[in-house]
Amino acid sequence: MNAVTVLAFTAFALIVHDCYSEEANTTPISVKDQCANVTCRRTVDNRGKRHIDGCPPGCLCVLKGPDSKDNLDGTCYLLATTPKSTTTSTEQSFNMEE
């Protein structure tokens, strides 16, 4: 019984070794970063709504400054996944009474 177990374990180890020791032909994924060196800007329209413009689809605008400021510049960064929406402007509500 022990000999059968050892033989089965050895066979399994050899199969696993063969499967994972082969060198696979891989092609590195080269993603063109459309967000590199792209700046974005947050502005407020006359109705008090914040707008973020400047980043292409699939990029996230990271603003440089506190959230309390309305007009800020930022940098676009590539997201891990591309959103289904193709809009490049984001609107946020802004309460002028605060």
Curated annotation (Swiss-Prot):
Compartments it resides in: Secreted
Top-level taxon in the UniProt lineage: Eukaryota
Entry's Gene Ontology molecular function annotations: toxin activity
Keywords: Complement system impairing toxin, Disulfide bond, Secreted, Signal, Toxin
Similarity section: Belongs to the RaCI family.
Protein name as it appears in the record: Complement inhibitor RaCI2
Cystine crosslinks: 35-59, 40-61, 55-76
A GO term from the CC aspect: extracellular region
Signal peptide interval: 1-21
Tissue/organ expression: Expressed in salivary glands.
Task of the protein: Complement inhibitor. Prevents complement-mediated C5 activation by binding to C5. Binds C5 at a different binding site than the other tick complement inhibitors OmCI and CirpT1, and the drug eculizumab.
